[in-house]
Amino acid sequence: MKHGKTMTAAEAGPRGEKVRSDACVRVEPETSGKVVVTVRGKVASLYGDAITAQMTEGCAALGVEHARVIVDDGGALPFVLAARLEAAVRRAECGTPNAEFLLARRPGNRGPSEKGRHRRTRLYVPGGRPNFMANAHLHAPDGVILDLEDSVAPAEKDAARVMVRCALRSLDWGDAERMVRINPLPGGIRDLPFAVGHGAQMILIPKV
C-alpha cells in the first residue's frame, strides 16, 4: 500500500445482468482491516468461497494488505478473475508497483511455433473479451490472434493487456498458434511485457 497518497477505489470489468463469462472486480483501498472480499452473483453460493480464496491470494501477490474487494461475478473463469483483480489494483495504485498475479501456466502453452506451419486461417479475438477466448480453439484455426489494437477502447487497453497475459498462460489453445497484435509503435512497446514470455508465439505489428 502506498503511503502519503490519496487512496482511490477502482474497478475493472463489465457490469450488468447480461454479463457472461466475465466479472467486475472493484478494489476499495483501506488503511486497516486486512482484505475483505464480497462476492455477488447468481453462483455466489456455489463458488463464493473459491472466489474469495483467489481474491485473497491475488491481493497478497499484488501487495495489497488492506482493502475491500467486491466481485460481481457473471460466471468468470479463474484467469478472468485474476486479470480483473490485477487491473483494478493497478488502477487504484494500492499495491506493489508492477506486481503481477500469475496463475500457473499450462504445460502446453510453452515453446516456439513449428517452422513451416500453415497460417491459412486466423481467428481474431478482442483482447478485452474473455467470453470469446475460452472456446476459441474449438473453431480449429491455424492461429488465434489476441488483439490489443482496434478491438480495444483506449480506456480499456490497460485491462486488456492483463487479460491477454492471463489467457495466454491459462487457456487450452489446442493446435492454434498463439499470436498477439500489439498497438502501433511506440505505444505498442507497453504491450510486449504482457505477451512475451507468457506463451505468445508471434507478435503482430499493425500497419504503419
Predicted regions and their residues:
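Conserved alpha/beta-domain cores
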Residues: K115-R117, R122-A140, I145-V208
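N-terminal intrinsically disordered, cationic/polar leader segments
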Residues: M1-S113
